[in-house]
A protein has these predicted regions:
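Short helix-capping segments at alpha-helix termini
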Residues: 78-84, 235-241
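Gly/Ser-rich helix-loop-strand patches that form or flank binding pockets
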Residues: 1-9, 29-33, 100-153, 258-318
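Rossmann-fold cofactor-recognition segment
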Residues: 85-89, 243-245
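Charged docking surfaces used in two-component/phosphorelay signaling
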Residues: 90-99, 247-255
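Small/aliphatic-rich secondary-structure junction motif
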Residues: 2-58, 161-211, 244-246, 293, ...
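Well-ordered alpha-helical segments embedded in enzymatic catalytic cores
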Residues: 23-26, 71, 98, 228, ...
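Glycine-rich phosphate/pyrophosphate-binding loop and the adjoining helix
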Residues: 196, 200-226, 232-237
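A short acidic, glycine-rich active-site loop
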Residues: 57-70, 214-227
Length: 319
C-alpha cells in the first residue's frame, strides 16, 4: 500500500479563536514531521434554544457557514505557505459529538485540541469538547494550553517556536502506562527527543502507610522501583532513544508538574487507565490536575492502544 492511506492521520479541532493558535501550530508541526495527513475541523453550534429549522435561523446558519469556510481557507493558506497540505471539514451540531464523528470518519490517529489559559478544562476552546474527547476518543489526544502571554508569539503562525526535545512520561507500571511509554518512544524517535520516565511513590498506591514503615523498608521499595525504571531506560537506550528516569515522593500531580517544570519538559505523555492516580483519566484528580495546570502540552493515550500485531519499540516492556 502507498499514498495517504499509509500515512498517520491527524485531526485538529478548532474554533479559530486566538486561544486555538497554539494548537494549530502543534498540529501543523506534527503533520510536517510525521508526514501525516492533516484534517482541520470546525463545528458550528447554535445557541441553546435556537431552532435551526426556522427560516430566520437558516439565514444565521448561512452566515456562520460562510464565516467558518473563510477561516478554513485562511488556515489552509497559512499551512500551505509552509508546505503543509491539509483537508478541511465544517459541521453543525454539538461540538463533542461532531469531533468524535470526524475521528471515526477520518480514522484519526491523533486529535489536537486547545485549552485556554489558567483555568484549563474549565475553559476549553469548544466548551466541554476537549474533556469529552479525551474521555472517549479511540485515539490519543493532544491538549495544548495557551495563556494570554502566549498569544502574540502564536500569531507568528504555524511552527513558530515549537520544540519537542524533552518528553516526560509518568509511569505506574500498569499496562496503560507502558502503552504511553511505547507511544512516547515512537514520538521520541520521530522528533529525536529524550524521554524521562517518572514514578511517583504515593503510599496509597501500594496499600501502605509509609509513616508506619521503617526507613529501610521505604528504601527497599524505592530501590526496587528504581531498578525497574532502569530496565526500561536501558531498553530505550538500546532503541537509540536518550532516556533517564526519576523516582519521587509526594502528591502525584504536583510531582509530575514539578518534574515537567524542572526538566523542563516540552510534552507530557500519560496513559488514561492504571492502578491509581493516572488510572481514572479525566474523572480522577491526577490527570485532570495535570491537564488543568501543565504549561506544556499533554498527550493522553487511551489503553489498549496497540494490538498484538504492533512491533514494539520496547519489546521487552510489552504489556
Amino acid at each position: 500500500m502507498s499514498g495517504e492511506t499509509d500515512r498517520p492521520r491527524i485531526l485538529l479541532a478548532t474554533d479559530f479563536s486566538k486561544w486555538a493558535l497554539r494548537a494549530e501550530e502543534y498540529a501543523c508541526c506534527l503533520a510536517a514531521t510525521w508526514r501525516a495527513t492533516l484534517t482541520v475541523l470546525t463545528v458550528l453550534e447554535f445557541p441553546p434554544g435556537m431552532n435551526p429549522e426556522y427560516p430566520v435561523n437558516q439565514v444565521y446558519l448561512g452566515e456562520l457557514m460562510k464565516a467558518g469556510a473563510k477561516q478554513l481557507v485562511e488556515l489552509k493558506a497559512r499551512a500551505a505557505a509552509r508546505g503543509i497540505a491539509l483537508h478541511t471539514r465544517i459541521a453543525t451540531g454539538i461540538p463533542c459529538e461532531e469531533v468524535l464523528a470526524a475521528v471515526k470518519a477520518e480514522d484519526s490517529d491523533l486529535v489536537v485540541v486547545g485549552t485556554k489559559g489558567k483555568s484549563g478544562l474549565a475553559h476549553v476552546l469548544l466548551g466541554s469538547t476537549a474533556e469529552r474527547v479525551i474521555r472517549t476518543a479511540p485515539c490519543p489526544v493532544l491538549t495544548v494550553r495557551m495563556d494570554s502571554d502566549d498569544v502574540s508569539a502564536a500569531e507568528a503562525g504555524p511552527c513558530g517556536g515549537i520544540s519537542l526535545n524533552r518528553i516526560l512520561v509518568p509511569v505506574d507500571f500498569s499496562d496503560c502506562s507502558l502503552e504511553a511509554v511505547e507511544y512516547a518512544a515512537l514520538m521520541a524517535q520521530r522528533h529525536n527527543a529524550s524521554l524521562t520516565l517518572l514514578h511517583v511513590l504515593e503510599p496509597v498506591s501500594y496499600g501502605l502507610d509509609f509513616t508506619l514503615l521503617q526507613t529501610g523498608k521505604r528504601e527497599e521499595i524505592r530501590e526496587r522501583l528504581t531498578a525497574r525504571l532502569g530496565d526500561m531506560t536501558r531498553a530505550l537506550t538500546e532503541a537509540k532513544i536518550q532516556a533517564d528516569s526519576q523516582v519521587r515522593g509526594g502528591t502525584p500531580f504536583e510531582s509530575i508538574l514539578d518534574s515537567a517544570k524542572t526538566i523542563p519538559a516540552d510534552l507530557i505523555v500519560m496513559g488514561t487507565h492504571g492502578r491509581r492516580g493516572l488510572s481514572h483519566a479525566l474523572s480522577g484528580s491526577v490527570a485532570e490536575a495535570v491537564l488543568r495546570q501543565s504549561r506544556c502540552p499533554v498527550l493522553t493515550v487511551r489503553s489498549p492502544k496497540y494490538g498484538p500485531g504492533h512491533r514494539r519499540v520496547l519489546s521487552a516492556m510489552s504489556t
